[in-house]
């Protein structure tokens, strides 16, 4: 998250997405929670928040894309970004940087969201794809999708259709190793793993690939006001903010 490398932002998947989904607002009784992870969560949070606003037609107050940490077998808390005291370091607890999003439980919506996710991968050579922030290495940056039911989910076919680069979808067991250079994306059961919101100062942050507009950064205050973001994660100050 602290290193910089330049790649083009994921705009094509948004512009190529289907017309705005019907019933894209939040709060439906059947909404599902999906986690997307690949590299630093700043890029994935931006991609998915823009997907919510542009494709689902959600207002700023309805955005649900929250940055955080998930996928670890260790249930300890708090779960935090790297800090001087070494308190609750997410990667040491087996977690990866991830984004949680609430979606209507339709195959079309999940496929659209997953297509945005898969569009973020870049060619590494030898028909292998990986995260764009190639200097961020280690299990804390591994790629996974977590949805209800995991590989047994009836919606998994939507994820497979969105898999633009033909990457291998494999079962994750929690606290999994890095996926960089393997052309793999783990699939987890989101109901089996807790999502830990990242520190507020890391939410809706500029990415290492460039800056985002003020209208995007303002989402932090909007989600704090509607309590979708909580101010106290129990984490100390970190090496970013």
Predicted stretch roles:
Residues 1-13:
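Cleavable N-terminal signal peptides of Sec/SRP-targeted secreted and luminal proteins
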